[in-house]
Regions:
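Glycine-rich beta->alpha junctions and the first turn(s) of the following alpha-helix
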Residues: 201-301, 371
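A structural signal for short hydrophobic beta-strand segments in well-ordered beta-sheet cores
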Residues: 146-149
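A short core secondary-structure module
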Residues: 154, 158-204
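Amphipathic, small/basic residue-rich leader segments at the start of a protein or domain
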Residues: 1-95, 116-123, 267-279, 285-288, ...
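Glycine-rich phosphate/cofactor-binding loops in nucleotide/flavin-utilizing enzymes
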Residues: 79-80, 100, 240-247, 252-256, ...
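C-terminal helix-coil-helix/basic helical segment that borders enzyme active sites and/or dimer interfaces
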Residues: 27-31, 275, 280, 297-353
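A short, Trp-centered hydrophobic/proline-enriched beta-strand micro-motif
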Residues: 124-132, 176
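N-terminal glycine-rich flavin-associated loop
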Residues: 93-112, 138
Length: 396
């Protein structure tokens, strides 16, 4: 048996023995495990799965061992991902730091930063949020105004960030700040990390139409940030931001691989609400559902293939924008089909004769509209595709 096949056999046996059966099914609303200083578990099995994967180094299996990873090569990491999918294992934790900031730190961070920031990520001990968008700097991110004034051994940060996911629950933030107000808007930006408990940081949740408040506005009033928390070169944050956004779009485009609350299996739901389609209209709904499910399956296979290409060293950065755009449209299409199939059952809210699943689907439909903006607006993705994939010139 060659080493890869041997590793696959060992991995399969370990997962069969260590992933509790309850952690091999879709995650209900409220059971996500977020890596954090005050991590919460819905049940003992979730904690057991978290601890076993953490101790194995499989939160970040392809990260170096010295930072808490398992040091797996791309080929071995692909085997692990394949076996996790085969068994339908839940993600042991959700951690934006691992998905987005971590790869940037591995590439651009100092050795001290890697030791201080990466290790807590690989142990699920810190919850991260992203400080990019501002009230007047969304799609045009380089127009940001939040300033970081040089004060000797530290920066003094003033301004605000908006649409910060889970800012009220996060331990740390990675943020873009303006460190040179006189430079061109792309040239005077730096990337820093800061403790959300620092004096001068305040957070205000934003109420959403879905009834939830995942987004926040964060205010900075004279916040002191040590210069050791500057990531990469001073005034060089824009290039790091572009790299980080590539990882963000990759993470968002991979959501379909995970059994997250909004990842509803379409065809079983169609069978549930239309057990025996009657007439042309219901038959047409079934046909739409089958087409949507096939598109979703094709998308997931493409994401897996792109992951293999990326691990083999191929440049897939431009393709990430394509996948993010496709994912957005597929989610909207899927929930539109569900709304039509479920009829009045799709009107579920907090109260009334609706199941938790029906209420979650209604919220998923509302959230699907926001996907056209979050993680990079669809219009921005089209511009990236035009330039980086199709090679079209700028139009002045």
């Amino acid at each position: 048996m060659n080493p890869i096949d041997q590793f696959r056999e060992q991995t399969r046996s370990w997962l069969e023995a260590n992933c509790p059966p309850s952690q091999r099914k879709a995650i209900p609303e409220g059971e996500l495990v977020w890596g954090a200083s005050d991590v919460e578990f819905h049940n003992a099995d979730a904690q057991l799965w978290f601890e076993r994967m953490r101790d194995k180094g499989w939160f970040c299996p392809d990260w170096p061992v010295e930072y808490g990873g398992a040091g797996l090569s791309a080929e071995y990491n692909a085997v692990l991902e394949s076996e996790l999918r085969r068994l339908k294992c839940r993600p042991p934790q959700i951690n934006l730091g691992i998905w987005m900031l971590g790869p940037v730190l591995l590439e651009f961070g100092s050795e001290e930063q890697k030791k201080n920031l990466l290790t807590p990520m690989t142990r699920g001990e810190v919850r991260w949020c992203q400080g990019f968008s501002e009230p007047n700097a969304g799609s045009d991110l380089a127009s940001l105004k939040t300033s970081a004034r040089d004060a000797g051994d530290h920066f003094v940060v003033d301004g605000s960030k908006i649409w910060t996911s889970y800012g009220d629950k996060s331990d740390w933030m990675y943020a873009l700040v303006r460190t040179d107000a006189k430079a061109s808007k792309h040239a005077g930006i730096s990337l820093i990390v800061l403790d959300m408990k620092s004096p001068g940081v305040s957070v205000a949740p934003i109420d959403l139409i879905s009834g939830k408040s995942a987004f926040c506005q964060v205010f900075f009033d004279g916040v002191k940030v040590p210069k050791s928390q500057l990531i990469g070169p001073l005034h060089g944050g824009w290039n790091l931001a572009k790299r980080l956004l590539q990882h963000e779009r990759k993470a968002m485009s991979k959501f379909g691989e995970f059994s997250l609350p909004t990842h509803f299996h379409l065809l079983p739901l169609v069978k549930q609400y239309l057990p025996e389609p009657v007439g042309q209209s219901e038959s047409a709904l079934v046909a739409r559902a089958v087409a949507s499910a096939m598109n979703e399956h094709s998308y997931n296979l493409t994401v897996q293939r792109m992951g293999e290409e990326a691990r083999a060293g191929q440049d897939v950065n431009g393709l990430m924008s394509i996948m993010k755009l496709v994912h957005t449209e597929q989610e909207r299409d899927k929930f539109e089909v569900l709304m039509d199939v479920m009829g009045y059952h799709a009107l579920g809210w907090d109260k009334g004769a609706f199941t938790p699943q029906e209420q979650a689907i209604t919220r998923g439909w509302l959230n699907s509209f926001a996907l056209t903006i979050s993680g990079g607006a669809s219009e921005i993705q089209l511009n990236v595709i035009a330039k980086r994939v199709l090679g079209l010139p700028d139009v002045k």
